């Protein structure tokens, strides 16, 4: 019997935001796949452990994805991870890959998900609460009303090129460019204020 792979979003950090579907999949799994080399350093694992303490007894397999833009290095890492996943699935194992937020938003899980599907094997996802939705809920604001647009902008973008976007802009993975982002938004805020326009920044 062939196994299956499930990418499980564990939310932004609050263990109370872990979904019932995620908890069930984790409890029913044979093996937990982590996007970190060590479970002690994996934020997603720490979140789950607070709700599903029995995860400590599960077989854990770290998936090592190097933080690099070198295509050859990334491809080699993906090949190794897929080979490990395929071996376990051929043994009939039910695998759960933990990922922060939602597996469909900037998640390393998809490197494996696509390979598994291409090989004709079973892969699916369980949604998690994305960080930007959690922030909006915490602030009590709407991300979009009526026909407003939402733009999700990763740190790889040139910040200056996004100031003309209409609607809501969500900047993600901007740690290395945070100072630059703040400076650009301050300049834009002042410019819009002079023109009698508003720019809400959270």
Where are these regions (language model features)?
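Solvent-exposed alpha-helices and their adjacent loops that cap or buttress functional pockets
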Residues: 1-2, 24-25, 89, 97, ...
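Class I SAM-dependent methyltransferase SAM-binding "motif I" and its flanking Rossmann-like core
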Residues: 104-165
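Short, charged, surface-exposed secondary-structure boundary motifs
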Residues: 42-44, 71, 134-136, 180-181
């Amino acid at each position: 019997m062939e196994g299956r792979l499930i990418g499980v979003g564990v939310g932004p950090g609050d263990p109370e935001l872990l979904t019932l579907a995620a908890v069930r999949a984790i409890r029913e799994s044979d093996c937990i796949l982590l996007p970190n080399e060590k479970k002690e350093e994996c934020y997603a694992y720490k979140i789950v452990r607070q709700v599903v303490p029995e995860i400590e007894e599960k077989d854990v397999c770290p998936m090592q994805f190097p933080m690099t833009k070198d295509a050859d290095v990334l491809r080699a890492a993906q090949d190794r991870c897929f080979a490990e996943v395929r071996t376990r699935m051929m043994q009939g194992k039910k695998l759960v890959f933990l990922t922060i937020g939602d597996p469909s938003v900037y998640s390393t899980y998809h490197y494996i998900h696509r390979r598994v599907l291409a090989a004709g094997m079973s892969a699916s996802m369980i949604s998690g609460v994305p960080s930007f939705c959690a922030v909006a809920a915490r602030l009590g604001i709407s991300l979009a009303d009526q026909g407003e647009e939402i733009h999700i902008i990763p740190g790889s973008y040139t910040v200056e090129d996004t100031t003309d976007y209409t609607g809501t802009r969500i900047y993600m993975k901007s740690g290395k460019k945070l100072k630059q982002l703040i400076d650009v938004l301050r300049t834009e805020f002042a410019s819009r204020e002079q023109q009698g326009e508003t720019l809400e920044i959270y």
